[in-house]
């Protein structure tokens, strides 16, 4: 993981993955600048339900079911509609459905680990998923990455893409994670933590987490591909 010109020396993979040459600026095409306009028409029925969108009929993935929900806002607190949100995550055991995941943890055949949703007219979004597991990484010996979900947000055009991660309130691994702790502002780190929301608990089985996303301003969510303060 690299935030433009920032490399996290404690997370060695960020050094090997970071570009070593100056970026090339390419003029954007008119289609990139003017579209697309997202609407619910591009969504499939269960795109925001990760407990169903990859599972076999009559089966469900393993793990604690959760709701992750919130609002996408601008710096003035205005809710933003028609924002395409895509998420991806590890399964309950901490395994990604990706060919480059070196973990020996078994894949959950009923969990794909990705979903998408378009914010409603009041900027609201919601996903039903499985609480992801933490997983070890070899950059600094026996350390683990805390539970997290990756978020990608598209605005009214493909050039407006922002990427971030949501962590889980109370996870003891957060304090030792070099990625979130590379953010110097402790208040900015707090904005990346999804808060337990018991009002969203359903049928005494599904836990709720609230994660609002602010795109600009002093209280903006920290994005991996956007400079601080921009």
Each PLM stretch: what is its role?
Residues 4-230:
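Beta-strand-dominated extracellular/periplasmic modules and repeats
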């Amino acid at each position: 993981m690299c935030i433009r010109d920032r490399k996290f020396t404690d997370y060695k993979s960020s050094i090997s993955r970071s570009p070593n040459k100056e970026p090339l600026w390419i003029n954007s095409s008119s289609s990139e600048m003017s579209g697309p306009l997202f609407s619910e028409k591009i969504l499939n029925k269960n795109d925001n339900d990760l407990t169903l969108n990859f599972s076999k009929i009559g089966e469900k993935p393993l793990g604690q079911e959760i709701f992750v929900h919130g609002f996408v806002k601008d710096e003035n607190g205005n809710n933003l509609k028609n924002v395409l949100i895509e998420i991806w995550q590890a399964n309950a055991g901490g395994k990604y459905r990706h060919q480059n995941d070196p973990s020996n943890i078994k894949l959950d055949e009923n969990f794909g680990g990705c979903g998408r949703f378009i914010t409603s007219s009041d900027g609201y979004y919601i996903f039903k998923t499985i609480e992801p597991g933490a997983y070890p990484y070899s950059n600094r010996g026996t350390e683990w990455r805390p539970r997290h979900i990756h978020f990608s947000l598209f605005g009214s055009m493909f050039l407006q893409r922002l990427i971030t991660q949501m962590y889980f309130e109370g996870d003891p691994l957060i304090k030792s994670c070099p990625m979130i702790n590379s953010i110097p502002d402790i208040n900015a780190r707090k904005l990346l933590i999804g808060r337990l929301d018991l009002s969203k608990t359903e049928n005494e089985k599904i836990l709720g987490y609230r994660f609002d996303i602010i795109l600009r301003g002093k209280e903006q969510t920290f994005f991996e591909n956007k400079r601080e303060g921009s």
